[in-house]
A protein has these predicted regions:
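Phosphate/dinucleotide-binding and metal-coordinating scaffold of catalytic cores
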Residues: 1-285
């Protein structure tokens, strides 16, 4: 599959609206991405710029070379280090010679692999001509908060095996993949849903932690609120171990699966992850 239809599921739209076609081709070992807006989208939303590397006009627009990656606005729909690690391990489960360091997938493969329900932002993806979104089956729904300890156990088993340079057991990868594969950052985490239907990111203790990082993150969130900073709702869940699970409500989700579209600072500035060494850009920008 080298084409995907991109659909806007933004909370302020009355109905979901198709945006255009995203395509990926391999040319001499490089991934070449192209995107073509639908005429109807541009007619209705010509003032919305999705990212600096996409202009609002008809016809295909291209990105060349592996160093460029995918269009920035769609890169925001991809997982980061933790999610990519889970996705690589899941893809390697069919390999007879499994390893703790599986082959890294491409951006295109990550985009197609992760769960629709936990994907960051307001974009949804499907095969052109299909009404069904990629990885949107009912069994991929976000797990309830009651399963928090079970998810933490899976994360710890995966970390322990990787630390021993052993491939994790398939059951732990499968258990954590759907709620955790869309997540960013390096620490183990997963999405969970509370009893009111609100979606939270659960940040689990790492086996390498030397103090209760979750508790300190929770304290930092409370201090930020006291200072008048607009922050997400947070909770702290104590475990039967010495450390806590830090819960932070997802800012890109509302109850009843309403999605709030988001764009990262990298997308808004037209920058790439890790480009600071070459450009001098950093968080101050």
């Amino acid at each position: 599959m080298n084409k995907l239809e991109v659909v806007a599921a933004f909370d302020w739209l009355q109905n979901e609206e198709p945006i255009g076609l995203l395509e990926c081709d391999n040319v001499r070992g490089n991934q070449v991405y192209s995107f073509e807006f639908y005429k109807e989208w541009l007619r209705s939303h010509k003032d919305i710029m999705l990212s600096k590397d996409l202009n609002n006009f008809l016809g295909k627009q291209y990105l060349y070379g592996n160093e460029n990656g995918i269009f920035r606005c769609f890169a925001d729909s991809l997982p980061d280090r933790w999610g990519r690690k889970l996705t690589d391990l899941k893809a390697d489960m069919t390999n007879e010679n499994r390893t703790y360091l599986p082959k890294k997938l491409t951006d295109w493969e990550y985009l197609q692999a992760i769960s629709d329900s936990t994907r960051m932002g307001g974009f949804r993806f499907r095969i052109p001509g299909s009404e069904k979104y990629l990885n949107s089956e009912d069994n991929l729904d976000i797990p309830p908060i009651l399963q928090l300890n079970e998810l933490m156990e899976a994360a710890q088993h995966i970390e322990q095996n990787l630390d021993k340079k052993l491939p994790p057991e398939e059951r732990w990868i499968s258990r954590l993949f759907n709620p955790g594969s869309s997540m960013g950052g390096a620490r183990p985490k997963a999405c969970i849903c509370d009893t009111d239907g609100n979606v939270y990111v659960a940040k689990f203790p790492s086996i390498k932690d030397e103090y209760d990082i979750g508790k300190w993150e929770y304290l930092a969130s409370l201090l930020a609120k006291d200072c008048g900073i607009n922050t997400a709702n947070t909770k702290l869940v104590k475990t039967n171990q010495n450390y806590s699970i830090f819960l932070s409500q997802r800012f890109d989700r509302k109850a009843e699966d309403k999605r709030i579209h988001m764009a990262s600072s990298l997308t808004l500035l037209g920058l790439r992850d890790g480009c600071g060494a070459d450009t001098g850009n950093g968080y101050i920008d």
